[in-house]
Each structure stands twice: as structure tokens, then as C-alpha cells.
């Protein structure tokens, strides 16, 4: 054990990027920050925390709730408040998802609200360097999704953002200002999503066939992989060019060209299956032990 720390949370949420980790209690007013040396700070937000996002550069963004207003605050890992964005819920909607860039200078947020009795959803980009200083509320781009609810946004890498809607996924490129790369529109409701630095994965259930259909796209929005499975996989991951799927006992690993690299049934069950940096090394965890395995 390199270090350990204790803290009190009721409903746990966390965000990790590089060597930085942030942990918060949803509805509480504390954010705990960590790096590889241990706990850095217990940040008192004064308002209830709804979401957090941490960057490799050492910044934490948090959505805070205050009656009819919500705030998106940025803190250093030591707890200094760097900026505040104030959003009126009845005008802007609720910030349902946020993600901060690796350098901490850009933030994307998905908002959902009601306007004239109809659902409205949007994705907004903020810039906190010199470019953003010249823009109103530091907004450098916004995209309207109408009644399509965007439930999650994330930075895949330093310059690529993905926004996941119910039946549409958008890829954006951002240096200082965002540009739409491609809208991926599908004729089904997306059940699960997963991602890596260079790929995104979509899963939906074919109820007629009682099978899951898994599709993987690159950051240009081109489909590069598709599989149908009746294994009822519960977990999906992408690491480099490896696509990992597993359930309580069964695990399969594909390469992005569709070839099976590994397929096995673990009789002791699977709690987690974690890819390591080396292409053929993994951490296998079950309820009784943890084991590092190397594929031939």
C-alpha cells in the first residue's frame, strides 16, 4: 500500500485524469482531491455538489446546486476557486453533464430544460484562457439539440469532445473554438456508451433477437467495428486498439479490426478486468483475489 485515506461520503462520485483523482459526496459540500502521493485537500464548496470533473493539469470543475440557480465552479487541487459560472435553471436548464480538458482551460457542458412546454437540450463550450476573456461569459460555442436529450459529454483527448444523445452522438474538435466533426445519427435508443482516447462505442439491445449490438467509431465518426452478442455483457472498455467486454464470468477481447484476441470463462467470476499499458497485460479481479495476467 503506497498510501491510504479516509473520508465520509453517502453517495459516491469520482473523476480521474492522469495522476489526479477527485472524490465527492453527491448532495454534500466536500470535494476530496488526491494524486499519487496521497490526499491533497478537502475542498469546502459551501453548496451541494452534483457533479465533478478533474483534469490532468490539476483542476477540478464542479456543478453546485442553489435553489433556482446552479454554479459551475473551477478549483485548483488545493482548493483555490479559479472561476464561477452562474446558470439560471429556468433560463439555461440543468447542467446534466460536464467535462474539463486536460489542460484545464476548456470545459464542455450539456444542459437540459423546458422552454414553452417543450424539452430543450444544448451543448455549450467555455474557454478560460486569453481567448475566452473576449467572449460573453467565456462561451466560445453552443449547439442546439432540440428535444434530443444529451446525457453525457466528455473530452476523449486534448482536442476531441463527444456528446452522447439518446439517438445521436456528436464529435467535436476544439483548439480554442469548437467545430463539429460529425453527427452520428442512429435509428435506435443507445443503451450504453464507452470510450477511449481514439474511439467511442455504442451498445443497443435488439429486443427481437434478444442480442446486443456493439458498434465502435473512430474520432472522425467512421464506424470501424460492429459485433452482435447474446452474452449479455455488462461492462465494455476500450484501451488503445483493444475492445474489452465482460459479464459475471465471460470475457472477450477484440482488436479494432474485429479479430478475437482473448476469450475465456472465469469460473471464479469477474469483478473487474482492467487493461494495462502493455497490449497483452491485464489486472483480473474477483471477489477473492486480484491477479495480473499476461496473454500469449
How would you label these PLM feature ranges?
Residues 92-209, 213-214:
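Acidic, serine/threonine- and glycine-rich low-complexity intrinsically disordered segments
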Residues 23, 62-63, 108-110, 163, ...:
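Residue position within the beta-strands of beta-propeller blades
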Residues 170-266:
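Intrinsically disordered, low-complexity segments enriched in Gly and acidic/Ser/Thr residues
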Residues 7-19, 47-58, 90-100, 140-156, ...:
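Repeated scaffold domains used in trafficking and secretory/extracellular systems
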Residues 29-32, 68-74, 115-127, 166-173, ...:
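Structural motif
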Residues 3-110:
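Non-cytosolic head/periplasmic domains of membrane-anchored proteins
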Residues 1-6, 37-44, 81-88, 134-144, ...:
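A short beta-strand motif characteristic of beta-propeller blades
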Residues 35-38, 75-80, 128-131, 174-177, ...:
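Short loop/turn segments that connect beta-strands within beta-propeller blades
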Amino acid at each position: 500500500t503506497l498510501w491510504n485515506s479516509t473520508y465520509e461520503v453517502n453517495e459516491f462520485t469520482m473523476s480521474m485524469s492522469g495522476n489526479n483523482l477527485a472524490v465527492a459526496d453527491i448532495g454534500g459540500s466536500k470535494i476530496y482531491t488526491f494524486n499519487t502521493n496521497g490526499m491533497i485537500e478537502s475542498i469546502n464548496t459551501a453548496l451541494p455538489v452534483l457533479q465533478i470533473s478533474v483534469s490532468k493539469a490539476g483542476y477540478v470543475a464542479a456543478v453546485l446546486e442553489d435553489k433556482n440557480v446552479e454554479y459551475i465552479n473551477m478549483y485548483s487541487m488545493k482548493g483555490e476557486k479559479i472561476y464561477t459560472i452562474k446558470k439560471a435553471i429556468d433560463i439555461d436548464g440543468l447542467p446534466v453533464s460536464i467535462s474539463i480538458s486536460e489542460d484545464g482551460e476548456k470545459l464542455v457542458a450539456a444542459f437540459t430544460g423546458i422552454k414553452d412546454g417543450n424539452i430543450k437540450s444544448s451543448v455549450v463550450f467555455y474557454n478560460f484562457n486569453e481567448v475566452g476573456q473576449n467572449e460573453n461569459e467565456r462561451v466560445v460555442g453552443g449547439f442546439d439539440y432540440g428535444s434530443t436529450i444529451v446525457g453525457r459529454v466528455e473530452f476523449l483527448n486534448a482536442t476531441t469532445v463527444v456528446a452522447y444523445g439518446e439517438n445521436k452522438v456528436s464529435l467535436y474538435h476544439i483548439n480554442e473554438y469548437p467545430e463539429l466533426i460529425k453527427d452520428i445519427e442512429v435509428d435506435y435508443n443507445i443503451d450504453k456508451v464507452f470510450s477511449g482516447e481514439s474511439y467511442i462505442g455504442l451498445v443497443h439491445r435488439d429486443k427481437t433477437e434478444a442480442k446486443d449490438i456493439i458498434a465502435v467509431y473512430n474520432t472522425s465518426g467512421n464506424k470501424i467495428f460492429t459485433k452482435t452478442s447474446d452474452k449479455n455483457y455488462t461492462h465494455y472498455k476500450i484501451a488503445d486498439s483493444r475492445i474489452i467486454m465482460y459479464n459475471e464470468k465471460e470475457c472477450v477481447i477484440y482488436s479494432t479490426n474485429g479479430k478475437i484476441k482473448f476469450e475465456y470463462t472465469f469460473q471464479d467470476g469477474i469483478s473487474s478486468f482492467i487493461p494495462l499499458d502493455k497490449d497483452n497485460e491485464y489486472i483480473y479481479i474477483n471477489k477473492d483475489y486480484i491477479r495480473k495476467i499476461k496473454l500469449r
